[in-house]
């Protein structure tokens, strides 16, 4: 990568700028430029796309995205210590990198980017799930074409989980309702500085133009929240109080009242949401 952008290896970058990952910000720096380039390639053809990156840190993935031909990258970094390193990346790729020192949860990113837009990020562990939920809960089709995101491996497995498994829950339902998510890369702890205690995984989400099954998003969100907040209870108990005769509504949706949330596929929850919406 250094031969492409003329910048030094990332270990030299963090040493020169005195950078160290802050656990309270959910940071773990990925310093292998071969891996960051691979993640950028897994995002697909970037040549005609704007790219949103959250938590770029010292800019390893940022460099990969630019080298893979991203039209423009908006990198949102909360940690001001990383800004000088990112400024060096911006100087190496004139006019193609905008660095925003902000909290990604508070930025209207769609207003700052030009479609088509792809989101590619090694998400900070402490906000990754919240950001994903927001991106999946927006008006559909959303402002983005695809998501290529790194999570703790446990979270990635929850995203792709199937009914009947311990990992299956609301995150799987929301992800699989509107996208086709796949784990495309697993990384060991020693790929990062400092090494986290767990493995990480990259998930690529291909958006669907329409949800797999019709359902009102707000009703579906409420039903799944109630069902999985008490996942070991029978649905007739966990959903009690939702409507006067929940057992009848469950049966009309093709669900036995004695079943539990983890047994019900996406299609079943969507059918239940439609019955409740009337």
Swiss-Prot record:
CDD domains: AdoMet_MTases (cd02440). S-adenosyl-L-methionine binds at residues 28, 30, 55, 77, 103, 122. GO terms for molecular function: 16S rRNA (adenine(1518)-N(6)/adenine(1519)-N(6))-dimethyltransferase activity; RNA binding. One of its GO terms (cellular component) is cytosol. Its EC number is 2.1.1.182. Keywords: Cytoplasm, Methyltransferase, RNA-binding, rRNA processing, S-adenosyl-L-methionine, Transferase. PROSITE patterns: RRNA_A_DIMETH (PS01131), SAM_RNA_A_N6_MT (PS51689). It is an enzyme of class 2 (transferase). It is found in: Cytoplasm. It catalyses: adenosine(1518)/adenosine(1519) in 16S rRNA + 4 S-adenosyl-L-methionine = N(6)-dimethyladenosine(1518)/N(6)-dimethyladenosine(1519) in 16S rRNA + 4 S-adenosyl-L-homocysteine + 4 H(+). Specifically dimethylates two adjacent adenosines (A1518 and A1519) in the loop of a conserved hairpin near the 3'-end of 16S rRNA in the 30S particle. May play a critical role in biogenesis of 30S subunits. Belongs to the class I-like SAM-binding methyltransferase superfamily. rRNA adenine N(6)-methyltransferase family. RsmA subfamily. NCBIfam families: ksgA (TIGR00755). This is Ribosomal RNA small subunit methyltransferase A. The gene is rsmA.
């Amino acid at each position: 990568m250094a031969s492409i952008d003329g910048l030094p290896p990332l270990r030299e970058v963090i040493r020169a700028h005195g950078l160290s990952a802050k656990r309270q910000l959910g940071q773990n720096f990925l310093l292998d430029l071969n891996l960051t380039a691979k993640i950028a390639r897994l995002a697909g053809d970037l040549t005609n796309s704007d790219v949103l990156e959250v938590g770029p840190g010292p800019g390893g993935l940022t460099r990969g995205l630019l080298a893979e031909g991203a039209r423009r990258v908006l990198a949102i970094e909360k940690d001001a210590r990383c800004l000088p390193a990112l400024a060096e990346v911006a100087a190496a790729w004139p006019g193609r990198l905008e660095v925003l020192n902000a909290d990604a949860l508070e930025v209207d990113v769609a207003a700052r980017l030009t479609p088509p837009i792809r989101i590619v990020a090694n998400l900070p562990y402490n906000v990754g799930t919240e950001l994903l939920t927001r991106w999946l809960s927006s008006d559909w089709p959303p402002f983005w074409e695809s998501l290529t995101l790194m999570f703790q491996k446990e979270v990635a497995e929850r995203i792709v989980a199937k009914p009947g498994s311990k990992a299956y829950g609301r995150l799987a339902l929301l992800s699989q309702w509107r996208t086709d998510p796949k784990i495309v890369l697993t990384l060991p702890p020693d790929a990062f500085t400092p090494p986290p205690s767990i493995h990480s995984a990259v998930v690529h989400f291909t958006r669907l133009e329409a949800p797999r099954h019709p359902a009102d998003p707000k009703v579906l969100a409420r039903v799944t929240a109630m069902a999985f907040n008490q996942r070991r209870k029978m649905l007739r108990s966990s959903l009690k109080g939702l409507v006067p005769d929940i057992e009848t509504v469950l049966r009309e949706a093709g669900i036995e009242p004695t079943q539990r949330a983890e047994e019900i596929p996406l299609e079943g929850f969507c059918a239940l949401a439609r019955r409740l919406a009337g």
